[in-house]
């Protein structure tokens, strides 16, 4: 018997370019597997999948390799921070 397919999306964004890739995956597919299947690294080769932080609709998922997706989920791949948010606030406060 065929496994049930669910619709999900994989998203990645840079300041000048964004991409959302819709996918039909079998139920039980993990966030990590969906990102691999999406082929998003062809568009953004700088993504390091094994160390990339991921989330679902803005909520971080600590273990993308074991997080099973649900119908309609959007897997977001997060870029590393360039500067610590606390340091950025301090820098802005110093500038006045």
UniProtKB/Swiss-Prot annotation:
> What cystine linkages occur within this chain?
none
Pfam families given in the database record: Ub-RnfH
The record's listing under InterPro entries reads:
Mopterin_synth/thiamin_S_b (IPR016155), RnfH (IPR005346), RnfH_sf (IPR037021)
- Record's family? Belongs to the UPF0125 (RnfH) family.
Q: What is this protein called?
A: Protein RnfH
State the organism named in the record: Hahella chejuensis (strain KCTC 2396)
Coding gene?
rnfH
């Amino acid at each position: 018997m065929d496994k049930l397919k669910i619709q999900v999306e994989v998203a990645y964004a840079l300041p000048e370019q964004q991409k959302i890739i819709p996918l039909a995956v079998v139920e039980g597919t993990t966030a990590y597997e969906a990102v691999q299947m999406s082929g998003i690294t062809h568009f953004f080769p700088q993504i390091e999948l094994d160390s990339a932080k991921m989330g679902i609709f803005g909520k971080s998922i600590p273990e993308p390799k074991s997080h099973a997706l649900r119908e309609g989920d959007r897997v977001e791949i997060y870029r590393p921070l360039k500067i610590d948010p606390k340091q950025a606030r301090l820098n802005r406060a110093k500038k006045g």
